[in-house]
Curated annotation (Swiss-Prot):
Phosphothreonine modified-residue sites: T458, T462, T476
MF-aspect GO terms: G protein-coupled acetylcholine receptor activity; guanyl-nucleotide exchange factor activity
Skewed-composition ranges (Low complexity): 310-332
Family named by the database record: Belongs to the G-protein coupled receptor 1 family. Muscarinic acetylcholine receptor subfamily. CHRM4 sub-subfamily.
Biological source species: Rattus norvegicus (Rat)
Protein name in the entry: Muscarinic acetylcholine receptor M4
Gene name as annotated: Chrm4
Intervals, Cytoplasmic compartment: 54-67, 128-147, 216-400, 456-478
Tagged with keyword RNA-binding: no
SUPFAM superfamilies attached to this UniProt entry: Family A G protein-coupled receptor-like (SSF81321)
Amino acid composition bias (Pro residues), ranges on this chain: 274-285
Length: 478
């Protein structure tokens, strides 16, 4: 991916003169080496980005809004690998521009438009991810395929409007062409200050914005992953499995139910048989407050009554946290043919402790009750699995964005630092250093597909299936 041709403005003119002067010193072996290396990089870039685009096209698992932005970035990288790399290699090897003014202007326009579109795609990816993690309730509703297409189109159209007319028609605006026929640079970038201004707008400012956004993305993503992380063994052990603490609900006074009925409880997604509690009656029983909510296939509701776990002094207005009560089993009307799921909320101090009971009407009614309980257990397990999948997606997307931004910064920084230095010292940078720095910008287009594969296992598997012609396995790659 490149954003500047190394031959633009006064710094570009200096580079062109150095290229021309050094050409006579290039030996045949040196030119063959340059052609081999750059040709190989061009081939890898083209193949890699075609794989990216095909993977998103054929694998439905990869057809997400975020990957559509990567598809657009892959298009830009493909153009860089197919055209810009090879034309610049020709310029370096021959030491002059041999293709004339028209091809020169078309190359520069294509190079700048595609490079600017790449930067804007990176900004879109960063902003998209930032809004996803900071506005998870409102932004996803507007994050549609149509919206992604409009944003991608806007990035390309804006890049074209900013660069193509100025590069192609500036000579007609000023009335003459000042670029020699054997050289190729942008005419309106006539001094180092202007070149540095374009570097600020096209590189330094986007890098600052993307870095700040990524810091916020990383912090918000870690917070969400930690929030939805499944409980560990220690956390589960410290928590009473049959009870869930909830805000205090409106109490209602009940009486203790008769004992003797069997009971099942839903605990952490598993159906367990709870033994009948053995709780001796307290010396001075005081009515407890509890709330009972039931649901059953017969739409019946019955009250639940509890035996108080401890006695209260009438002189106390408030009481410290009481021990969690043991729920008493309850019986139903023998004539009822429906089993019920009972949710009992027990007040302990300023909290409520809630448990779920499955109460059979008759032994024959145990089966439907167990089926309902298993359904609830399945729902609980699905929720845990979804939380784990969401955490995995968060990490995967964040890693991919980090890799892309890191590759962009590492490969584009050397050239743009040289642009800054050249503003104050036009003879401080050797010609070969200019060429290497500019080629690093192109190498970014080679690295991006590797970033996708290393950070996303689905991309990696789809790449492998495409390369091995295992087309039947592509749809199952996850």
């Amino acid at each position: 991916m490149x954003n500047f041709t190394p031959v633009n403005g006064s710094s570009a003119n200096q580079s062109v003169r150095l290229v021309t002067a050094a050409h006579n010193h290039l030996e045949t072996v040196e030119m063959v080496f340059i052609a081999t290396v750059t040709g190989s990089l061009s081939l890898v870039t083209v193949v890699g980005n075609i794989l990216v685009m095909l993977s998103i096209k054929v694998n439905r698992q990869l057809q997400t809004v975020n990957n559509y932005f990567l598809f657009s970035l892959g298009c830009a990288d493909l153009i860089i690998g197919a055209f810009s790399m090879n034309l610049y290699t020709l310029y370096i090897i021959k030491g002059y521009w041999p293709l004339g003014a028209v091809v020169c202007d078309l190359w520069l326009a294509l190079d700048y438009v595609v490079s600017n579109a790449s930067v804007m795609n990176l900004l879109i990816i960063s902003f998209d991810r930032y809004f996803c993690v900071t506005k998870p309730l409102t932004y996803p509703a507007r994050r549609t395929t149509k919206m992604a297409g409009l944003m991608i189109a806007a990035a390309w159209v804006l890049s074209f409007v900013l660069w193509a007319p100025a590069i192609l028609f500036w000579q007609f605006v000023v009335g003459k062409r000042t670029v020699p026929d054997n050289q190729c640079f942008i005419q309106f970038l006539s001094n180092p200050a202007v070149t540095f201004g374009t570097a600020i707008a096209a590189f330094y400012l986007p890098v600052v914005i993307m870095t700040v956004l990524y810091i916020h993305i990383s912090l918000a993503s870690r917070s969400r992953v930690h929030k939805h992380r499944p409980e560990g063994p220690k956390e589960k052990k410290a928590k009473t499995l049959a009870f869930l603490k909830s805000p205090l609900m409106k109490p209602s006074i009940k009486k203790p139910p008769p004992g003797g009925a069997s009971r099942e409880e839903l605990r952490n997604g598993k159906l367990e048989e709870a033994p009948p509690p053995a709780l001796p009656p307290p010396p001075r029983p005081v009515p407890d407050k509890d709330t009972s909510n039931e649901s059953s296939s017969g739409s019946a509701t019955q009250n639940t009554k509890e035996r108080p776990p401890t006695e209260l002094s009438t002189a106390e207005a408030t009481t410290p946290a009481l021990p969690a009560p043991t729920l008493q089993p309850r019986t139903l009307n023998p004539a009822s043919k429906w089993s019920k799921i009972q949710i009992v909320t027990k007040q302990t101090g300023n909290e409520c402790v809630t448990a779920i009971e499955i109460v059979p009407a008759t032994p024959a009614g145990m089966r439907p009750a167990a089926n309902v309980a298993r359904k609830f257990a399945s729902i609980a397990r699905n929720q845990v699995r979804k939380k784990r999948q969401m955490a995995a997606r968060e990490r995967k997307v964040t890693r991919t964005i980090f890799a892309i931004l890191l590759a962009f910064i590492l490969t584009w920084t050397p050239y743009n630092v040289m642009v800054l230095v050249n503003t104050f010292c036009q003879s401080c940078i050797p010609e070969r250093v200019w060429s290497i720095g500019y080629w690093l910008c192109y190498v970014n287009s080679t690295i991006n597909p590797a970033c996708y594969a290393l950070c996303n296992a689905t991309f990696k598997k789809t790449f492998r299936h495409l390369l091995l012609c295992q087309y039947r396995n592509i749809g199952t790659a996850r």
